[in-house]
């Protein structure tokens, strides 16, 4: 039986649960449920604090876990990324009062409040900077106004919360984060894990691609195939119309409109883009 950790709340949890449902796994049901056994797939899901997930996986109590890259790194747990999931994107950065021109070098001897102390200590050590790291479990942005810290290090998505507190980021990004699946360091992916990962990957592919269908004169087929190469080449079928063919290929969702414009200029007709629910590539 496969044992997998899922964030118990927040945006990471919502997105993870949605992907699992699309991949054919049992849902959580009640929001306070701590674990769910999916009898059909012989998988048990454990809903844990995102910060704790890497620790459980590193200890071998769980096979895989979905968490944030920043959380896994900050835990110092012996885990490795198995797959990046493309949601929950954020950056971990230093911030200080916006009316002051801060540089990272100015952190020397200062107090830095954060919920990710290990990430900060590792970065400071790499830079050769001595500073006091103050661990807080939340509302880090208010710590400067309360006189607890001189600067902060926190997760930044839109920056709206920082601006409300009169803060601005400075220095390079410490950690570029997103949701990831982690496994124990040196973990050998067995068949059960492969099935799970393949399903999740299939959902991600479906989210990132569209299926494109169009008709085109065979004279322009070679040119159109360069525009829509697909994954292993497009599917080409003859039409009743003389010298015309129907073409089907997967295209990156973000590029779909540009690709359709190019095909139109080439003389393609009946260009249709449709959603892909599940994929195996």
UniProtKB/Swiss-Prot annotation:
GO MF: ATP binding; ATP phosphoribosyltransferase activity; magnesium ion binding
EC code(s) of this entry: 2.4.2.17
Catalytic activity: 1-(5-phospho-beta-D-ribosyl)-ATP + diphosphate = 5-phospho-alpha-D-ribose 1-diphosphate + ATP
The organism's place on the tree of life at top rank: Bacteria
Subcellular location: Cytoplasm
Family: Belongs to the ATP phosphoribosyltransferase family. Long subfamily.
Name of the protein this chain belongs to: ATP phosphoribosyltransferase
Originating gene: hisG
